């Protein structure tokens, strides 16, 4: 979400979010004057908060109450306000070191095993973030690519078909790349182009793990077909990861008791739906947290933050999910994440998730 805020609006939104995260109480201008050195009067803060409310970044839960951040307000906070000028970098660095130190200490006193490593990581992640921690088991025996084919279904519409080594078939329907559909090319020309791109995919991916698809170097595709490469890159990776979910998706879950003490989870029915998701619908959750973000450097962990209604799974549309992928040799093996109320400490959660993903990547390398 791109919203242009003045420096004053940024600082007041930042202070409002930080105060609400800390107190779970609607925030008024008086509290901000007392707690933060914003350099403006209470009346000015009220006016700015009114502007932020009209922009959809804050709202009043009750007429007489202060204001709280909306999902959009949290999104601006995460994307634009957690920057070196506003972020407590020392604090996040300390948290990252705590994760690494705690994991090293945990392994020092235990006989090293995969289960012990991941259980320890899940518990440490929950303790440091105050959230539910989620860690997927590494996918070491995934299916591989047998064949990929692009087929023209009708004018302007194509289908990507993936066949695995076990002959499972997966498909994705999509429009032609805009650069090709705008010129209204002859269908026979499109068929030939799709076959050339299909040949490229098969020559580079046949026999490789589905999880390796994200490492494909699309720059090797002939220049005249680069419009397909740019368009298909995410679609091919998305289809592969959607197909890679194992029959038994195991997710280690820790920290449930702690996070359910938060006021946001006071409704019993909401708690039940979250527990049901964690216990009975792990495949849906696995697919969500194992979605692969586009990375420039596949050896570094990128943290994905989904806030409130950005989550496609209904039971957690009032929660925030922060996740990252751990890898071996640049190939994704599994994911780590934390789940909590939208009113969570994003800086801490992002720091510990990134640190845990990096540590596990090193452990598996």
From Swiss-Prot:
GO biological process, one term: negative regulation of DNA-templated transcription
InterPro entries: GAF-like_dom_sf (IPR029016), HrcA (IPR002571), HrcA_C (IPR021153), WH-like_DNA-bd_sf (IPR036388), WH_DNA-bd_sf (IPR036390), WHTH_transcript_rep_HrcA_IDD (IPR023120)
UniProt KW keywords: Repressor, Stress response, Transcription, Transcription regulation
Keyword Repressor: yes
A Pfam family hit: HrcA
UniProt-recorded Gene Ontology molecular function terms: DNA binding
Gene3D superfamilies: 3.30.450.40, Heat-inducible transcription repressor hrca homolog, domain 3, Winged helix-like DNA-binding domain superfamily/Winged helix DNA-binding domain
Annotated family: Belongs to the HrcA family.
Biological role: Negative regulator of class I heat shock genes (grpE-dnaK-dnaJ and groELS operons). Prevents heat-shock induction of these operons.
NCBIfam families, per the entry: hrcA
Stated name of the protein: Heat-inducible transcription repressor HrcA
Native organism: Trichormus variabilis (strain ATCC 29413 / PCC 7937) (Anabaena variabilis)
Upper taxonomic lineage: Bacteria, Bacillati, Cyanobacteriota, Cyanophyceae, Nostocales
Gene (name only): hrcA
């Amino acid at each position: 979400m791109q919203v242009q805020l003045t420096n004053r609006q940024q600082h007041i939104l930042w202070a409002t979010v930080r105060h609400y995260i800390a107190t779970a109480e609607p925030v008024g201008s008086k509290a901000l004057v007392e707690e933060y050195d914003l350099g403006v009067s209470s009346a000015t803060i009220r006016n700015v908060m009114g502007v932020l409310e009209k922009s959809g970044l804050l709202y009043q839960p009750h007429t007489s109450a202060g204001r709280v951040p909306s999902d959009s307000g949290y999104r601006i906070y995460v994307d634009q306000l957690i920057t070196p000028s506003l972020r407590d970098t020392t604090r996040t660095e300390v948290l990252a070191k705590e994760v690494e130190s705690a994991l090293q200490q945990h392994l020092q006193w235990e006989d090293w095993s995969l289960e012990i490593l991941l259980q320890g990581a899940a518990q440490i992640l929950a303790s440091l973030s105050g959230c539910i921690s989620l860690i997927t088991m590494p996918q070491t025996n995934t299916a591989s690519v047998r064949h990929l084919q692009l087929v023209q279904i009708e004018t302007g519409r194509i289908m990507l078909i993936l066949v695995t080594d076990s002959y499972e078939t997966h498909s994705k329907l999509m429009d032609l790349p805009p650069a090709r559909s705008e010129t209204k090319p002859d269908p026979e020309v499109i068929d030939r182009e799709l076959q050339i791109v299909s040949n490229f995919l098969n020559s580079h991916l046949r026999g490789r793990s589905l999880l390796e698809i994200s490492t494909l170097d699309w720059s090797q595709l002939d220049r005249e077909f680069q419009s397909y490469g740019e368009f298909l890159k995410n679609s091919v990776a998305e289809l592969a990861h959607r197909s890679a979910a194992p029959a038994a998706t195991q997710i280690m879950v820790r920290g449930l008791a702690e996070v359910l003490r938060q006021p946001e989870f006071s409704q019993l029915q909401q708690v039940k739906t979250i527990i049901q998701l964690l216990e009975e619908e792990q495949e849906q959750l696995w697919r969500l947290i194992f979605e692969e973000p586009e990375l420039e450097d596949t050896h570094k962990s990128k943290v994905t933050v989904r806030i409130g209604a950005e989550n496609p799974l209904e039971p957690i549309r009032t929660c925030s999910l922060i996740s990252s992928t751990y890898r071996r040799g640049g190939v994704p093996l599994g994911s780590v994440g934390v789940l909590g109320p939208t009113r969570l400490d994003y800086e801490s959660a992002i720091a510990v998730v990134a640190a845990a993903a990096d540590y596990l990547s090193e452990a598996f390398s």
